[in-house]
Amino acid sequence: MQTTKALLISPVLIRSCTRGLIRPVSASLLSRPEAPSKKPSCCSSPLQVARREFQTSVISRDIDTAAKFIGAGAATVGVAGSGAGIGTVFGSLIIGYARNPSLKQQLFSYAILGFALSEAMGLFCLMVAFLILFAM
């Protein structure tokens, strides 16, 4: 059974470890001195590991930026699908009108509806791409 004295952390120990806790992981790994120096044993504490999870390094930010661009590019592919859909709708309108010219008004109404739905999906994909780029 541990005593209360063993569980308490002294203020001197906290002050000596604060510098190591604030530095990001990449900075502490890259700036290691070649000669061994006296460091307190608190640097391998679980508190330090928990604190370093919130630090971001340059590599982590670069990975996040690359992921943003990849996600935005994937979302932009839907705009090409919208263009293909619009072409299909109006191509079908021309074929339908050539087969039965008396249905001109009804075919045109359906073509406009198909155009609107296809364009809405393209704009939705573009909106998602902009949200990925600028809102995250």
UniProtKB/Swiss-Prot annotation:
Binding partners and assembly: Homooctamer; the c-ring consists of eight c subunits forming a circle, and each subunit adopts a hairpin shape. Component of the ATP synthase complex composed at least of ATP5F1A/subunit alpha, ATP5F1B/subunit beta, ATP5MC1/subunit c (homooctomer), MT-ATP6/subunit a, MT-ATP8/subunit 8, ATP5ME/subunit e, ATP5MF/subunit f, ATP5MG/subunit g, ATP5MK/subunit k, ATP5MJ/subunit j, ATP5F1C/subunit gamma, ATP5F1D/subunit delta, ATP5F1E/subunit epsilon, ATP5PF/subunit F6, ATP5PB/subunit b, ATP5PD/subunit d, ATP5PO/subunit OSCP.
Chief subcellular location: mitochondrion
Any single GO CC term annotated in Swiss-Prot or TrEMBL for this entry: proton-transporting two-sector ATPase complex, proton-transporting domain
Family per record: Belongs to the ATPase C chain family.
Origin: domain of life: Eukaryota
Disease linked to the protein: This protein is the major protein stored in the storage bodies of animals or humans affected with ceroid lipofuscinosis (Batten disease).
Site (Reversibly protonated during proton transport): 119
Keyword tags: CF(0), Hydrogen ion transport, Ion transport, Lipid-binding, Membrane, Methylation, Mitochondrion, Transit peptide, Transmembrane, Transmembrane helix, Transport
Protein name as annotated: ATP synthase F(0) complex subunit C1, mitochondrial
InterPro entries: ATP_synth_F0_csu, ATP_synth_F0_csu_DDCD_BS, ATP_synth_F0_csu_sf, ATPase_proteolipid_c-like_dom, F/V-ATP_Csub_sf
Origin species: Rattus norvegicus
UniProt-recorded Gene Ontology molecular function terms: ligand-gated channel activity; lipid binding; proton channel activity
Modification(s) after translation: Trimethylated by ATPSCKMT at Lys-104. Methylation is required for proper incorporation of the C subunit into the ATP synthase complex and mitochondrial respiration.
Chain segments annotated as transmembrane: 77-97, 112-132
Function: Subunit c, of the mitochondrial membrane ATP synthase complex (F(1)F(0) ATP synthase or Complex V) that produces ATP from ADP in the presence of a proton gradient across the membrane which is generated by electron transport complexes of the respiratory chain. ATP synthase complex consist of a soluble F(1) head domain - the catalytic core - and a membrane F(1) domain - the membrane proton channel. These two domains are linked by a central stalk rotating inside the F(1) region and a stationary peripheral stalk.
